[in-house]
């Protein structure tokens, strides 16, 4: 086998590989003989079909298959010999199989050589927070609102009420698509509508007709409405006031608390909030570390890896549409290219951090991650056992553990400053509610 390597552009490489043509010819002959013994063709006894007949019928297909196998096998031998690390599958261009040698070209990308830089320049503002009794009180109020019952109220609508309304929206006197509804149920203060809409309904009574003027946000999803001032003609059909459950032992049973009453419920809420806070704090620090790592290291990315990641993201996006996805056109790749490129870059850089620090997933950390995740379920031990019995899930958790260890390794050389933050404000921002 003769091999020549050519750098075409960036990470792309072109291998020209030449092998004796007899590699193909001898294998083709053996395959034709084997097929002749198995073939069932009218006019010939089983096992007695002439090779020439098989060649005429199946020769091209057999030759193509064997040529592909020869190219794949010799390509693997060539990249091992040349110490090349392909990123993605190669494209093969076969030459003629006539003559003494068979020559083909394999075009592919390689992984970039990553040399980590600027790790000491990564800066992290490490947030610190704790769950207070006031935070638990706030969560209990949220739970009360979630379990509220509603009844018709003969008074002006107020925050927390449900309002049934008809509305028609217009811009410069012209109605716009999606701006009209009848008997629309809206909980005032929920933030479901654009700013100013819900507060504009407050203070009015059932039977009243009125107009409110609001401005669509600049980042509104509908391009034709961004930043536009709209007038909504509203008819308030009904006001329903919320009846909140009392905070007592009976209330605690709604959440599976059978012993200990409200004190036990508060303890469970505090524990859950503390777990969520710890996860959010770690995620915040991790994001800062990865942002710093990406900013400090500019590396060339294989297009094949980006394309592969685009397909993963596109598939995940389509799955979120559920049954509707079958009737939707394929989402364009450019929607995901930027995110895919970042994920590829982060993966390559973290891979080098793991390699440089000779990191291996720690068993104790893996089990701690599984236990933490399982604690949110009714029967944690069942979830832990399920994970430990599933190698694919275990490998996923090992990858998570390795990523954590890599982030911790980067934190050792980063510049850290602590900043105390408010629990509610921090969690709202972390969950996108701010």
Swiss-Prot record:
Assigned EC number: 5.2.1.8
The EC category is isomerase
Q: Could you state a single Gene Ontology molecular function term?
A: protein folding chaperone
Catalytic activity entry? [protein]-peptidylproline (omega=180) = [protein]-peptidylproline (omega=0)
- Entries under PROSITE patterns matching the protein: FKBP_PPIASE
How is this protein annotated for GO cellular component?
Answer: cytoplasm
- Describe the location of the PPIase FKBP-type domain by residue ranges: 160-245
State the UniProt keywords alphabetically.
Cell cycle, Cell division, Chaperone, Cytoplasm, Isomerase, Rotamase
Q: Where in the cell is it found?
A: Cytoplasm
Task: Provide the GO biological process annotations.
Answer: 'de novo' cotranslational protein folding; cell division; chaperone-mediated protein folding; protein transport; protein unfolding
Q: What is known of its domains?
A: Consists of 3 domains; the N-terminus binds the ribosome, the middle domain has PPIase activity, while the C-terminus has intrinsic chaperone activity on its own.
* Role, per record: Involved in protein export. Acts as a chaperone by maintaining the newly synthesized protein in an open conformation. Functions as a peptidyl-prolyl cis-trans isomerase.
UniProt family annotation? Belongs to the FKBP-type PPIase family. Tig subfamily.
Specify the protein name.
Trigger factor
| Species assigned in the record | Shewanella halifaxensis (strain HAW-EB4)
């Amino acid at each position: 086998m003769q091999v020549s390597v050519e750098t075409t552009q960036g990470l792309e490489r072109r291998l020209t590989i030449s092998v004796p043509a007899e590699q193909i010819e001898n294998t083709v002959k053996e395959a034709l003989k084997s097929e002749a013994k198995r073939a069932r063709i009218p006019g010939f006894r089983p096992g007695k079909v002439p090779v020439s007949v098989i060649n005429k019928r199946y020769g091209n297909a057999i030759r193509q298959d064997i040529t592909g196998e020869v190219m794949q096998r010799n390509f693997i031998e060539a990249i091992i010999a040349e110490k090349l690390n392909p990123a993605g599958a190669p494209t093969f261009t076969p030459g003629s199989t006539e003559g003494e040698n068979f020559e083909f070209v394999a075009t592919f990308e390689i992984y970039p050589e990553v040399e980590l830089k600027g790790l000491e320049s990564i800066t992290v503002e490490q947030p610190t927070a704790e769950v207070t009794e006031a935070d638990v009180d706030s969560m209990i109020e949220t739970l009360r609102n979630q379990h509220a019952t509603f009844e018709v109220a003969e008074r002006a609508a107020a925050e927390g009420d449900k309002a049934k309304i008809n509305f028609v929206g217009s811009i410069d006197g012209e109605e716009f698509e999606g701006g009209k509804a009848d008997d629309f149920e809206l909980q005032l203060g929920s933030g479901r509508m654009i700013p100013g809409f819900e507060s504009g309904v407050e203070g009015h009574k059932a039977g009243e007709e009125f107009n409110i003027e609001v401005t669509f946000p600049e980042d509104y999803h509908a391009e034709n409405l961004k930043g536009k001032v709209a007038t909504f003609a509203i008819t308030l059909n009904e006001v329903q006031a919320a009846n909140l459950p009392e905070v007592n032992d009976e209330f605690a049973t709604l959440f599976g608390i059978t012993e200990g009453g409200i004190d036990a419920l508060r303890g469970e809420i505090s524990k859950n909030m503390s777990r969520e806070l710890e996860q959010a704090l770690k995620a915040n620090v991790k994001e800062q570390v990865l942002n710093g790592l990406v900013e400090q290291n500019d590396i060339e990315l294989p297009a094949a890896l980006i394309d592969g990641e685009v397909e993963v993201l596109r598939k995940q996006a389509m799955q979120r549409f559920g049954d509707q996805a079958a009737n939707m056109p394929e989402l364009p790749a450019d929607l995901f290219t930027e995110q895919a490129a970042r994920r590829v870059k982060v993966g390559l850089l973290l891979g080098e951090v793991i390699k440089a620090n000779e990191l291996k997933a720690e068993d104790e950390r893996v089990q701690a991650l599984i236990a933490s995740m399982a604690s949110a379920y009714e029967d944690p031990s069942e979830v832990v056992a399920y994970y430990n019995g599933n190698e694919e899930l275990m490998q996923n958790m090992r990858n998570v553990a390795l990523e954590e260890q890599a982030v911790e390794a980067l934190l050792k050389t980063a510049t850290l400053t602590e900043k105390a933050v408010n629990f509610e404000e921090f969690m709202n921002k972390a969950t996108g509610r701010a």
